[in-house]
Every structure is written in C-alpha cells, then in structure tokens.
Amino acid sequence: MSYGGGYGGGGYGGGYGGGGGGGGYGGGGGGYGGGYGGGGYGGGFGGDRMGNLGQGLHNIDWQNQSLAKFEKNFYVQDPRVTARSDAEVEAFRAEKEMKIQGKNVPRPITTFEEAGFPDYIMSEIRRMGFTAPSSIQCQAWPMALSGRDLVAIAETGSGKTISFCLPAMVHINAQPLLAPGDGPIVLILAPTRELAVQIQTEATKFGQSSRIRNTAIYGGAPKGPQIRDLQRGVEICVATPGRLIDMLETGKTNLKRVTYLVMDEADRMLDMGFEPQIRKIVSQIRPDRQTLLFSATWPKEVQRLAMDFLHDFIQVNIGSLDLTANHNVAQHVEVCTDFDKRSKLLSHLEKISQENGKVLIFVATKRVADDLTKFLRMDGWPALAIHGDKQQAERDWVLAEFKSGRSPIMLATDVASRGLDVRDIGYVINYDFPNNCEDYIHRIGRTGRAGRKGTSYTYFTMDNSKAARELVQILRESKADIPPELEEMAMYGGRGGGGGRGRGGRGGGRGGYGGGGGRGGYSSGANSYGGGGGGYSSRW
C-alpha cells in the first residue's frame, strides 16, 4: 500500500543541528527540526536526571512511628484448587515450567475463576477476551493475594503487569479511603517512561469500576499535570525513580500510606544505575508493607535487592534461570561487516514488506537511529525513530504511528525500547548487536509475545566476537541454526558476553521544535511525510 497526503508537509527534522537547541514551533512545514543544542541533559534514562537526587530526603525512624494496621491477606483458596492432589499440582507446575521457592507457597490456580477476584475485575477480564491466565499469573496471583512478599522471575511479555496490578486493586479496596494530603497506597517503580505508561494503562482498565485513581510520574514530561494528580490524591502511583524522588524532595507527595510496593523490571532498573534512588525511595515506605519484585533475570545484584527489601519472601521462576530466548521467536544470525549491514537490512525489509508486519530495528546509538531512519525514508520506507533525546511529544507520536501501523518500521535504542508494549510486532532486527546477550534476549522478546510467533534477524560483526560463545549457547538451546562463522568466532574469540552496559551520556541538550534546519535535519526527506501531491509512495 502507499501513503499519500495526510501529513501536509511537515515531518520532524531530528538532525544534529548546531546552535542552541532552538525553542518554539518552527514555521513552514511545522515539523520537528531542532538538532541537539548546546548544554543540557540528553534525555538519558526516561528523562530522569541521575545527579544527587534524594540528598534532601531523610531516612525515617520507623521504630518510633505510630503505624495504623492494614489488611493484606485476601486469598481464600478455591475448593477446586484444594481438591487437587500434590501430584496434580506438581504436574501442572512442570507443564508450565514453574519452579517455586520458600515456605508455604500457595498452590497455583488454573483458571481466572479460581483466583477469587471480585466481580468488577472478572467482568473486565471477560470483556478483554482472555481465555486462560498465563503461567506467571497462575502462581503469582495466589502469592500476591495472600499478602506475602514475592519475587517473580519471568521473561518479557509473559503477563507480569496483570500479575501485580489485579492484586493491587483488591488491596486498595480493603484500605481506608485517602484523606486530603495522603500519598498513594500502591507504588509501582518502573525503569522507563514507556513502561510506566503501559502499566498505567492496565491500571486504568481494571480500576475504573471501583474508581481507583492513578497517575504516572516520569521525566521528560511537564511536571504540572503530574503534581496536580498527586495533590488531588491517587491510589496508584506508577513512577520512574528519578522523577519520584524529585516529587518527594519538593513535598509534592509522600509515601506514608504505601502498603503495596512493586518493583517492575528490577534487573533493568539496576542496570540503569537506579539502585541509590530505589534505596532512598524504599526508606520512605513503612517496613511492614507488602513488596513484590518482578524481573526478567535473577543476577546477584537483584538477589541482594530482594534480600534487603523483602521479608520471608516466596519466589516463582517461569522457565530456566539460564539465559534463554523465547522459543516462539525464530532466530536468524548473519555474520557480516558493518559495510554489509545496510544492504542486508534492505533485503530483509523487502521480504518482510510482503507480509505487512511491524518491524522493530535496534541500533546502538541515537546518531545511528537518526541516520538510518533518514536513509530508509529517502529510499521510500515508512520508518521512524525513538530514542532518549527525543521530546516526549515526539516519542508519543512515533509510538502511536508504529502501533497504528501507519509507520510499521521503528528504529530504537535499548533504553527507549525497554518496556514498550506493542503486541503485534512480527519482526525484530538487531542492526547493531547489543553490549551483552542479556540485552539480546530482551530485544528479541519484543516479538513472539502472548503466544504469537515472531522472527528476529541479527547482524553480527567481528567487533561483537566477545559475545559469540554465549550467543551460540542461546541459539543451541533454542534449536536455531548457527552460522559456521559464528561457531568459529565462539571457538577462537573472546570470552563472556561483552562489556557492561554504558550509563548513557549527557548529550548536548534536547533541541527545540525548530523549522527543520540544522545540519542533517530531515524536514525535507528522511522523516517528513510529503503533503500536497499525495506524499511518497511507500514500499509497504
């Protein structure tokens, strides 16, 4: 199909312009033109400034605080669950690749009805057309509803958000109503703004009928509406650590009413350097809270966090704790040079375009994201880019275009992509291999979600040879084809999975909405939709 008209002349510029990051909406085409101006913070992780956040927050002496009692155990085991033999329970857990640890772990449920959710949640589940709970939900719901601290390890796209959101609704409805000046009852920490918004969307769906209010607090967006939400009172606050600490330090909210704490994608939050902020936030929450920690992996750093913050916790792992890929994703690795990548990409896009599938292309840097997007759009491909230096309004627009299928090709950096909830991505292309194989697993986990099949293509160069051995192990475990060149690299190349993740630098400011100027701005090509005479004819 071809795209015509529609966007009347103005795409966004997005080039690396000189100057001071010009403000204001530019004239003419109205696109985003500004480059990266001088100074300022380059967006980093979800817009949160790392700095010395939390210095103004004092630890609370909880021993001398008068704390109101609260209820957190709401679980009544369904008679059908009780009637199952131990052998049946073990067989079900084995079938779902479910491993448990801890004392007195509740039995898993097998249907939504067995969870014992109230009618206002069950009606929403039925309306959304879910047929059966996912593996993580079968075990995590009884654990969470029983009021226990829990650790849940499961791959991205496994239904983790619903696993903690629905018990949160039950928890809130059993607590006293918020009084003026009260902070939230449920706090959900997430690494990125995209994941925070995704969680908020699910909380809104299931909280409407019981009038549970929520807000998402994250950097890169105006503080005003977020402050208003907090001051009016919300039962659920979904937040990235940096912006939340900002709100706490300036007295815009407090965490004295929090009795249900969730840390989602805990491994990623630690990777991104948020541990000091997380520790400062948790110090502001009463120690007898219920704490739930969700993570895709279980490295030592996450284990230490769990030991410090959770009490007598129970744990469920879905699948192996070894680094394994989603088996619903067909993995294809091609060993090549950097010079070969563009031609390989075009070849794969030609093939994929016959199926009208959505494609997520991962690149290493913001510059590559912008340059490659420009190259693809000049060649007629409907591609857009998302990364940490883009304004929030632009990121939201790009994501909406991708989700709707109007622009079915999206380029992304790792930080921008984590937590993106686009369920019908058919293909992932690793244009640049990530720093380590853990990120490779997360990347290809963007496709093959919710039981669907997906495909990944990965371009692997000599510069990536340190990761060859671990990648071969992942491919072998998935029964995927292993290129001979990759096996050779694994035999003779470096050991381990490559260097650790970088912290993401302080880029030169954000740049404003300009008029398409600046060196390399794309308002006349790469990212602009042609107006007037019917736009460009897409290859899609």
Curated annotation (Swiss-Prot):
Gene3D superfamilies: P-loop containing nucleotide triphosphate hydrolases. The gene is DBP2. One of its GO terms (biological process) is rRNA processing. It catalyses: ATP + H2O = ADP + phosphate + H(+). A motif (Q motif) lies at residues 110-138. Its EC number is 3.6.4.13. Associates with polysomes. The Q motif is unique to and characteristic of the DEAD box family of RNA helicases and controls ATP binding and hydrolysis. SMART domains: DEXDc (SM00487), HELICc (SM00490). GO terms for molecular function: ATP binding; ATP hydrolysis activity; mRNA binding; RNA helicase activity. ATP-dependent RNA helicase involved nonsense-mediated mRNA decay and ribosome biogenesis through rRNA processing. Residues 344-490 form the Helicase C-terminal domain. This is ATP-dependent RNA helicase DBP2-A. ATP binds at A154, E155, T156, G157, S158, G159, K160, T161. Residues 141-316 form the Helicase ATP-binding domain. It comes from Cryptococcus neoformans var. neoformans serotype D (strain JEC21 / ATCC MYA-565). Residues 492-519 are annotated as: RNA-binding RGG-box. GO terms for cellular component: cytoplasm; nucleus; ribonucleoprotein complex. It is found in: Cytoplasm; Nucleus. Residues 494-540 are annotated as: Disordered. Keywords: ATP-binding, Cytoplasm, Helicase, Hydrolase, Nonsense-mediated mRNA decay, Nucleotide-binding, Nucleus, Ribosome biogenesis, RNA-binding, rRNA processing. A motif (DEAD box) lies at residues 264-267. Belongs to the DEAD box helicase family. DDX5/DBP2 subfamily.
